[in-house]
């Protein structure tokens, strides 16, 4: 029976249905009450942290569905376009920003790919570098608040470790995210030098015009992130503020959200959040079964007997998570892997919040890992480019992100400086 359920998963069955079926089969085999599955959904609905998820998702989808990306592209290009490789730097910054708000680098590729790739090619960037920047330049945006994967990780990990909160993860991701932004932006500048891109003259008039056009969107990251990092608002309050601000600005100030379009965006948000919550509820039911059967303890004993050195464990952990990121979306992976991984990492002395940053960085990289990373397929469809060409174009950025991952993994202070 379990084999049949797994076969359905491989054939494309919804993951919540697969998890639900696995939970019920496992509960029946163990003689456990089926009502526990329903109880998990009820407990999930009462979690205070969960309130932040739909509001941040709505804000991200509204931004992606409006012309905000065009205005912000004009603004960042006016501010940085005069630099050598300025447009490539703009590409990395803009993709990272949108990924942080949508929680999905694939959505960023869909929203910005058709805008950024022609601009990069027109400026004279080599096609390989341009494809790599558009496909992988925004992956590490999941480390910045108000990323949905950060919120989901906190929801899953907090019952295991009280140190893991949304606010703690938002702070922990800041310095690693800035490091990634600097390294990938540096690569973009180098790509501009290498292609001998002529520098554009800096225009105060163009910068002022671009700033005036996007004057209502410029305060968004400063207000929201300042409130979160400054401790003035909890995550759920910041989520409501973000959604309200974005809806007012895009709907009433810029008038780019007519009711018909907003209805579609709300529908997409509900589909995303509803899917995540169903997967989360069913996944937590499976986790309860695994805990009842002492599976985490068995894994602890098995791994502990084979790996004694924490540094070796971290290396094995990264290899495992990169493989997971290639074949599983970040939400499903968080629900399935974190409950088993968190107790194991604690045994090796890995700080729980630091583990969250390592986990999300790995899965973000896995999205563009050749040959099966999800972003490669999304970019192939959006940019009308062969998959293997995109995989080859992403190799340089993959190497840079792996170097960043090593620093994140073996330099805990990078993640924990603001948390402590």
Predicted regions, residues:
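Alpha-helical transmembrane segments of multi-pass membrane transport proteins
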Residues: 1-420
